[in-house]
Amino acid sequence: MTEKRTGGGQRRIAWVLLLASAAAVVVTGLFGTVLVLSQLGGGPGAWTPSFWLRLVAAAALTIVSLMLRSLRWIFLLRRAHVRIPIRDAYIGYFAGLSLLLTPFLLGEIALRALVHRARGRVPAATVVVVNLWERLLDLAALGVITGLTAVVLGRLHIWSAALLVLALLTAVPAVLRAGRIAAEWLARPAAHLFDKSLAPDTGRLSDGRTWLAGMVVSLAAWVLPGLGFWIVAAGWGRPISLVTAEYAYAASSSLGGLVLAPGGVLVAGASLLNELQAAGLGGTAAALSVFGIRLATVGVATALGGVFLLVHLRTPASATAEHFDEIADAYDVQIPESRRDALLGTKTRLMRDVIERHLSGGRRGLDAGCGQGWYVRRMRELGFDVDGIDASAGQVALAARHIGTNGRVRVGSVLNVPEPPASYDFVYTINVLHHLASVDEQRRAFAELLRVLRPGGLLFVHEINTRNVLFRFYMGYVFPSLNCIDEGVERWLLPQQMAMYTDAPLVDLRYFTFLPDFLPQPLVRLLAPLERLLESSPFAPYSAHYMTVLRKL
């Protein structure tokens, strides 16, 4: 007990020191800014409406940049085998920015570790490694931007050349592995302040494809604040090129990052001021430009972090186990009704055709994961005797209302079907299996669904087809960010990998739907002929949905 109290006291002292250091950095930065502006005569009269409009534009670019970096954060977490609801990951990432101004990234790392542990039980060691890894990506991207813009400007000196070489070296596999091992070594003592978790499973971070994807996003993210700096600095009537602005911002940010200055305070600002003066922009205009871009980048990021820290303190973590009970009443409105109806018609028609072709007289079926019962009702309308089960009691209650007294719907899951063996001629599951927590659970689900099938019976598996990279990105990042059906923790099943889950033989495989759910109905009708053409073309395996049919021997 004494040891626990001592550990808790040490953590409280550490948090007080981090907050005090952040406050000291803010005061120092503000004092230095006021001092420079007062010496240059940059009073409120110089802060014209045009200046503030340029600041707003730069701040908007910063927000877009931070959104890209938050997506990169979630991508890296997933590569480190972390499954946390995407909204909780956003909260953890952005909340860390509130302590951006603490020395050596300590506040940012500590707060992210705390929030991710509270909202997703993510091991602290993993959060620390991922945080260090994303900062390495930042430095590499800034080095590339600095080096390439220096070449264009004819200013490739030792500093910019060294940054470019170091950035390119990070693409070497041996360097990546060494960097990851170093990050894991650094993470151990820091992580023990929060938990005694085992060594993080972060081996995939040093994979070449992971690094390439991270670098592409990092380059896009860091070009944007450079563009914001150009917008702020170019509004004083003095010509300054976009390439010069990108070079100045990337070089100054690299310097601030390498010396681990909190938020680059004093270091990055002084470097930016020197670059503007070298480009012929001096005096009040240069000082206000530096003040403006620092406010629009570090200031906006820190303020946004404060907002998300409040969100963390005021909202509970996502409760995945009760997720579908919580969203039962809002489930149907997540996808436009016209697209829901179109998919309902397509999927039930495909199943009817396969059943009539491959089953002689078998009409009894089970909808495993029936949701609100729309597919049960449609299959019964087509003449089949279909029951429904769902793990969510809230969804079952709504399904009973939609189906009426003719249907049998009850609580049950794909892992535990409340029926004896060989009860059904066919079983279907529609967009359910990707919600299971692990590949092992998915294998158990296949075994359980096959258990309740009669010999020769058919198992229909309808799933999202993430073979298409664009659709995988949409379903993995965009859809769970905008809708509450998925949470970003799904484990997608690919049709060509069914042997991973079961040895039941394949009877049929159909690909369908290319148009996104969010398209308005008039556009869907216009593009329907193109969609039908794609569904019957060699591009069909890259569709949005698929149906695989397996037979129980």
Regions found by a protein language model. Name each.
Residues 474-476, 496, 507-553:
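A C-terminal cap/extension of S-adenosyl-L-methionine-dependent methyltransferases
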Residues 317-360, 460-482:
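Conserved class I S-adenosyl-L-methionine
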Residues 372-416:
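Class I SAM-dependent methyltransferase SAM/SAH-binding core
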Residues 436-448:
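A short, conserved alpha-helix within the catalytic core of class I
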Residues 489-505:
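Short alpha-helix
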Residues 428:
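A conserved beta-strand element that flanks and buttresses the S-adenosyl-L-methionine
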Residues 1-94, 151-257, 283-290, 296-318:
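Predominantly cytoplasmic-facing regulatory/coupling regions of multi-pass membrane proteins
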